[in-house]
């Protein structure tokens, strides 16, 4: 029972809500049915909307109910009957994955989505994903999601909604489809009373080899209005206490939620036609037919439901006129009035064809004659499956009638439903509401033609006795003497009513409209500060959906590489609003530019590079702003100019392939059809160029928002070759724990691109030089383009290009060769027995199952079959490199080799300078692993390296080579590295099942976006180098990064000695560093360290033993939640056959005492140190070996004594 004080509190709260005009809603948190999954947060934490196919809405206003699948499936369940089901999944970065390589939310392989995998059955299969029960969708409810599928062999995708006994098909498609950036689905559910469920199904044939995936489901404006104690001024108060805007009364939709806004008592003076029983007062001239969806669908573009009943059994009008023929519907005659507006609300449907057109005319009756029709509305194109609401207010001094004209394009349909005349639309006296007669002319075409000098085909422009075809309109080249063919092609100051050809194609509550500045209020003047001036302004529209406003140009192109759009814009909005420019090509949108966070309200000049594009493409302004929000929110565009777009105009820089990017980008320009782009940037922060360290370079960040798509292109203008061979040299930068692939290719007209060079994964935080020989066909008509492509098969890191140079003649031999793209100029000798191959099919010549570079069957290597039938015993097969330049100092030539299990013979390495000298000889049985070989090279003249395979006469034997590299400095001992010249024999190992992240290589002095030690251990300065890994990129899920040694021979006892560094803030969860021994018997963790550590280098010694060949693996991982900080390694030393020696404690600098507590703490630490040493001495007497020790590096304050002791199994270590 509620006490008087309780009643008083409730009364006070109720009165406060009354006085403030705010929502007053009882708390329904404990109601399991009525207040759950209805798109309204009844609980303060919105817990009543959890697991409803979405999660509770954000506290930020105007945000949708969303499920991005990052936490869980949000209640979506698989109800498929076959063995293949929808699952919440996450992709790796591997290109051989059947599903998407990234999600849509994050755009990386760390994100989650719902997917159904490969179907290998003999019959077509349908997989269905169903939502939980949802309740009460508003008429404005819109479901948006992103989908991905392999378009080659998926039969159909469907989105259905089931309520009561009826299932509505909201959307269905048989393609085409594309990757994440290309396909967003937005469907309007319409008003749904009571409970309903949504299902997404994919039907695939028996040969489908790819995955179907869904991500980022959003429910926009689905909740019914909540009861209000008092409505804003002018709003209608519904019977259920909800509030709706005045224009929502009698509009044919249940906006209140209880249909009181459509009460016949309120709407009795409106003339509404829903076509359920006929045409009402409207008259069909030709082309329209009344129909419904159930059992009548003649194509997928046919309306699946009407608007009035939101049912497949509801009636509507649809145009059945042949393409090119206009269907006309006209109203009865209404009285004219200058004192009020006659409002006409209507719903139309345009779907299936870009050639669909709909127009609304008003035809007035003068004193003696009927006046020509006046066009009030015109829409064309593909608007999706929604019924779009619009409204016109007609004020006429003379009687008038309304004409509705529709023309369908190929495969498309135009529909009409719910034609509603307001109470101010009064019939002419004596005119029946059931029928009327048409007097006067009607439009026989949607676009009435003026008199022309010459008849041209449809779509052609007549000028100067010419018929300009569509592909030459807006191609940035003037064909007409007066330039009529380029008049409405995007360039405009909006002073002309044609608006430069920009056309609003919005379907929601916002629209683009040419407006006069002094009337718009936001802003009050145009760009030229003229109050009477015009600009393209974002305004309110009569649509019911909260969709973006869109304005589109006519078809443009082709354009040249220097094509730019210049404009001024105004943008002021809350954080959820945006203003953007996109390019539409072949149904896909590429985001070119987005306005930064809300400006101060003034006009801003902006230049946007469009670049070289093929015909046809269109430009589109897209914006979403809450015009009713606080402040002067709004968006506007003015003075749009397309400059330097003629593709036939060339400049001197177009032939400049050599470029340091200091002045401009020379002949290089960015490619398109992806939201990821190369940018010419100036050195700043962690990004620096190669030329000066402070200049410009080309930069690609695969995570740079809104980067999406498979990759980014950087290519030259077409070039004319002048010599048969040229050498292209360039500097590249690949850095990051999971950076993708950088490729170089040559493109010739009419031919497939030829891959010339590629690198994958991190190459350390430094610039590397590479060169490639270009082979040309010297024919006058043969031109070529060079193109770099940065592939987004990795998402953490950056790519850079700088200092391109082209010279006549061939290049020197490459310093690095992975054989992924070519044979790198290696010559197989007279017999040609060395071949480049991979084992992807499993049916190729004899050789390793996987390569060393990628660790996959798709990777390439060089191999020679040493079987006696091809290479008799004692015979040799040589593989010779191109010439290397003279060496100014000693260098290390390293390579990875693979010998077949049975002894294939001897692999010898020679260096050919003025004479030929043998540097290395390898023989014996092989195995299943790639092994590292290395030789020290000194050469004062040009030299070559020769690999020679001498056969032993064993059947089914081979020798293989991969990853040949030349680095400055002498070669390191096996398992050892000071990291001053690179990673030595240590390399990235893929983490099982998830691809992997790479350890990186850097110095403290080199700028980097990732935290790392400020100095190394080897030299103790910022110029020294080390290996490191940034743990923050791992994310949850137990992933790790592995750095593995070369295979090491079996050992009874050996000592591993290294220095490590951890830099984790104390308030973060910590990462872990582990040492694993990996062999064919499995993996064994022999040491680990985690937790917060002070930023310092610590020493570790571990004694290891193994009865078979093994690898040492350093694993960087997380103990739980994501950590923020680096783990680093330096001075790794593997002492084969030696016991570890107790390290001498380092003498760090002694800090002067600053306070009594510090002195007391120091004494206590000294006591603990002596106690620890005494304990160690006692352990020594007990004959227990010290298997692992830590010590602090010289030059660092060792405030805490750090020691780790690991007791290893006897199978791994042995007592001294």
From Swiss-Prot:
* Location relative to the cell: Membrane
Regions of this protein lying in the Extracellular compartment: 22-1155
Tissue and organ distribution: Apical endosomal tubules of developing rat intestinal epithelial cells.
Topology relative to the membrane: Single-pass type I membrane protein
Question: Which residue numbers delimit the LDL-receptor class A domain?
Answer: 27-54, 229-269, 454-491
InterPro entries, per this entry? ConA-like_dom_sf, LDL_receptor-like_sf, LDLR_class-A_CS, LDrepeatLR_classA_rpt, MAM_dom, MAM_domain-containing
**Entries under PROSITE patterns matching the protein:** LDLRA_1 (PS01209), LDLRA_2 (PS50068), MAM_2 (PS50060)
Q: What is this protein called?
A: Apical endosomal glycoprotein
The protein's organism comes out as Rattus norvegicus
């Amino acid at each position: 029972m509620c006490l008087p004080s309780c009643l008083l509190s409730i009364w006070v709260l109720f009165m406060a809500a009354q006085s403030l005009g705010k929502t007053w809603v009882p708390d329904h948190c404990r109601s399991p049915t009525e207040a759950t999954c209805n798109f309204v947060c009844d609980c303060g934490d919105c817990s009543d909307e959890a697991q409803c196919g979405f999660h509770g809405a954000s506290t930020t206003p105007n945000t949708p109910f969303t499920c991005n699948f990052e936490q869980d499936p949000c209640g979506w369940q698989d109800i498929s009957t076959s063995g293949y089901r929808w699952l919440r999944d996450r992709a790796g970065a591997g290109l051989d994955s059947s599903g998407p390589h990234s999600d849509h939310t994050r755009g990386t392989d760390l994100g989650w989505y719902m997917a159904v995998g490969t179907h290998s059955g003999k019959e077509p299969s349908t997989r269905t994903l169903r939502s939980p029960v949802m309740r009460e969708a508003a008429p404005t409810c819109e479901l948006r999601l992103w989908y991905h599928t392999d378009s080659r062999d998926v039969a159909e995708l469907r989105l259905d909604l089931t309520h009561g006994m009826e299932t509505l098909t909201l959307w269905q498609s048989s393609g085409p489809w594309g990757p994440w950036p290309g396909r967003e689905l937005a469907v309007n559910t319409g008003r749904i009373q009571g409970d309903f469920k949504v299902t997404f199904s994919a039907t695939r044939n028996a040969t489908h080899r790819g995955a179907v995936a869904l991500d980022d489901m959003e429910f926009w404006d689905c909740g019914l209005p909540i009861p209000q104690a008092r409505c804003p001024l002018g709003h209608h108060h519904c019977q259920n206490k909800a509030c709706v805007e005045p224009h929502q009364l009698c509009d044919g939709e249940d906006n209140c939620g209880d249909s009181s806004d459509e009460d016949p008592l309120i709407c009795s003076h409106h003339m509404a036609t829903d076509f359920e029983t006929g045409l009402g007062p409207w008259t069909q001239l030709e082309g329209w037919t009344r129909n419904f969806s159930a059992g009548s669908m003649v194509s997928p573009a046919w309306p699946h439901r009407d608007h009035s009943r939101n049912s497949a059994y509801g009636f509507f009008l649809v145009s059945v006129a042949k393409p090119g023929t206009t269907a006309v519907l006209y109203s009865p005659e209404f009285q004219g009035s200058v004192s009020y507006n006659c409002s006409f609300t209507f719903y139309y449907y345009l779907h299936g064809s870009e050639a669909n057109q709909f127009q609304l005319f008003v035809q007035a009756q003068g004193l003696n004659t009927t006046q020509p029709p006046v066009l009030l509305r015109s829409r064309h194109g593909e608007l999706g499956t929604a019924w779009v609401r619009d409204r016109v207010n007609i004020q006429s001094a003379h009687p008038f009638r309304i004409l509705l004209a529709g023309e369908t394009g190929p495969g498309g349909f135009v529909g009409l439903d719910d034609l509603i005349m307001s109470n101010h639309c009064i019939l002419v006296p004596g005119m029946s509401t059931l029928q009327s007669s048409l007097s006067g002319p009607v439009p026989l075409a949607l676009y009435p033609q003026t008199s022309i000098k010459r008849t041209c085909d449809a779509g052609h422009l007549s000028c100067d006795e010419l018929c300009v075809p569509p592909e030459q309109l807006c191609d940035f080249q003037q064909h007409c003497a007066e330039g009529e063919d380029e008049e409405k092609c995007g360039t405009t100051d909006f002073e002309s009513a044609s608006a430069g050809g920009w056309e609003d194609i919005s379907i929601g509550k916002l629209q683009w409209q040419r407006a006069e500045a002094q009337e718009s209020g936001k802003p009050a003047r145009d760009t030229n500060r003229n109050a009477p001036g015009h600009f393209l302004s974002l305004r309110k529209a009569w649509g019911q959906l909260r969709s973006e406003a869109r304005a589109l140009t006519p078809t443009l192109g082709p354009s040249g590489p220097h094509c730019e759009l210049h404009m001024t814009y105004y943008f002021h909005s809350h954080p959820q609003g945006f203003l953007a420019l996109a390019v539409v090509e072949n149904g896909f949108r590429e985001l070119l530019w987005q306005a930064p966070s809300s400006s101060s309200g003034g006009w801003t000049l902006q230049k946007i590079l469009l670049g070289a594009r093929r015909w046809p493409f269109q430009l589109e302004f897209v914006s979403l702003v809450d015009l009713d929000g606080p402040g002067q929110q709004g968006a506007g565009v003015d003075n749009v100019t397309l400059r330097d777009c003629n593709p036939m105009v060339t400049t001197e820089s177009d032939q400049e392939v050599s470029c340091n990017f200091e002045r401009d980008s020379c002949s290089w320009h960015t490619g398109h059809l992806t939201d990821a782009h190369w940018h010419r940037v100036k050195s700043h922060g962690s990004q620096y160029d190669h030329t000066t360290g402070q200049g410009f370079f080309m930069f690609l960040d695969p995570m740079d928002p809104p980067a999406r798509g498979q990759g980014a292109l950087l290519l030259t203008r077409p070039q004319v070759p002048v010599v048969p061979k040229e050498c292209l040299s360039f500097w590249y930068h690949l850095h990051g724990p999971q950076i993708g692939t950088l490729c170089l290719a040559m493109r010739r007209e009419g031919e497939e691109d030829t891959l010339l060079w590629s690198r994958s994964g991190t190459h350390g935080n430094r610039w590397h030089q590479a060169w490639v020989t270009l082979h040309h066909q010297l024919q006058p008509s043969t031109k070529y383009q060079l193109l770099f492509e940065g592939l987004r098969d990795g998402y953490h890191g950056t790519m850079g290009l700088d200092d391109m140079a082209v010279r006549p003649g061939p290049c020197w031999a490459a310093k690095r060769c992975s054989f992924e793209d070519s044979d790198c100029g290696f010559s197989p000798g007279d017999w040609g027995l060395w071949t480049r191959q991979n084992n992807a099919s499993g049916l190729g010549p004899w050789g390793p199952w996987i390569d060393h570079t990628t660790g996959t069957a798709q990777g390439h290597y060089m191999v020679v079959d040493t079987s006696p039938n091809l290479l008799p015993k004692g015979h040799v097969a040589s593989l010779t490199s191109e010439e290397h330049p003279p060496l100014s100092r000693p260098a290390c030539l390293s390579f990875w080799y693979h010998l077949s299990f049975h002894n294939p013979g001897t692999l010898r390495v020679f260096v050919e300078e003025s004479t030929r000298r043998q540097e290395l000889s390898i023989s014996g049985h092989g195995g299943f692993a790639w092994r590292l070989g290395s030789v020290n090279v000194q050469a004062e003249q040009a030299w070559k390296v020769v690999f020679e395979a001498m056969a032993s006469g064993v059947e089914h034997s081979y020798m293989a080579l991969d990853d040949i590299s030349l680095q400055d400095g002498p070669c390191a001992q096996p398992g050892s590295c000071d990291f001053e010249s690179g990673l030595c024999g240590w390399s990235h190992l893929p983490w099982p099942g998830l691809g992997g992240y790479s350890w990186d290589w850097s110095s403290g002095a080199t700028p980097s976006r990732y935290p790392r030690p400020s100095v190394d251990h080897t030299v103790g300065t910022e110029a020294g180098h080390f290996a490191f890994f940034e743990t923050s990129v791992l994310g949850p899920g137990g992933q790790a990064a592995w750095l593995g040694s070369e295979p090491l021979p079996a050992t009874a006892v050996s000592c591993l000695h290294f220095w490590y560094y951890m830099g984790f803030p104390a308030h973060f969860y910590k990462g872990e560093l582990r040492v694993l021994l990996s062999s064919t018997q499995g993996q064994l963790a022999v040491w680990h360290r985690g937790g917060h550590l002070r930023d310092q280098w610590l020493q570790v010694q571990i004694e290891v033993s193994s009865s078979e060949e093994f690898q040492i693996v350093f694993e960087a991982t997380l103990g739980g939640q994501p950590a923020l900080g680096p783990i680093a390694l330096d001075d790794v030393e593997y002492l084969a056959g030696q016991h570890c020696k107790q390290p001498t404690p380092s003498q760090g600098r002694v800090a002067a005492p600053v306070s009594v507590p510090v002195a007391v703490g120091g004494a206590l630490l000294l006591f603990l140190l002596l106690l620890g040493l005494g304990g160690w001495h006692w352990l020594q007497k007990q004959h227990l070996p010290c298997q692992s020790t830590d010590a602090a590096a010289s030059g660092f304050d060792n405030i805490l004594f750090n020691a780790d002791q690991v007791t290893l199994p006897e199978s791994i270590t042995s007592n001294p």
